[in-house]
Amino acid sequence: MNRVVEILAPAGSMECLQAAIAAGADAVYLGGTRFGARAYAQNLSEEDMVQAIEYVHIHGRKIYMTVNTLLKDREMEELYAYLLPYYRAGLDGVIVQDIGAVKFIREHFPKMPVHASTQMTITNTLGADHIKQYGITRVVPARELSLGEIRDMKRQTGLEMECFVHGALCYCYSGQCLLSSMIGGRSGNRGQCAQPCRLPYQIDGKKPADLMSLKDLCTIDILPELIDAGG
């Protein structure tokens, strides 16, 4: 099957964004100063984000912003003020974890496309079909799914599928890990993951080893099959 896919690249800084566009990416995604899963990354300021939106659109590409953490009630109004300048600048969509934030964004920014983050832990077709009622148009399914599961989700829901093709994997299902919060007071679901799974651990006096650090995801050998599955 010949399918046109969107190559979406991460862009943690303006330099990375420009490099991704120059390399041929169809779209980029990045975080702003709040509500992103990488609170300690080199995220863009409001001024830089607006400039990034303009830069990407000049080159005929798309730009999505992450709002992929869990939000508290008091933060919803703050979310409105945070997103408003980007909405006005023409942001192409937001990648969201919190279902309450999805509902809020759909109500206050009705023309803003909303994508379900992998942090939402969509692992089955029923879950993907359920979130359609909130106006979600694209889902980033859990990275642990098989090609067959992705294919079934695509066929039965009609949602766009966005799949990771390379990068680190979480020790737990995305959006479900509490390890960083429990042992370090830094919640991964609030953008503060300290990545304790990357540290060496010693068991029963044996030599310290990377017991919880998974191998990186790499799908280059199965890209045609992934595309055919709907990814």
Predicted regions and their residues:
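Conserved nucleotide-cofactor-binding alpha/beta core module
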Residues: 124-126
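As written
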Residues: 135-136
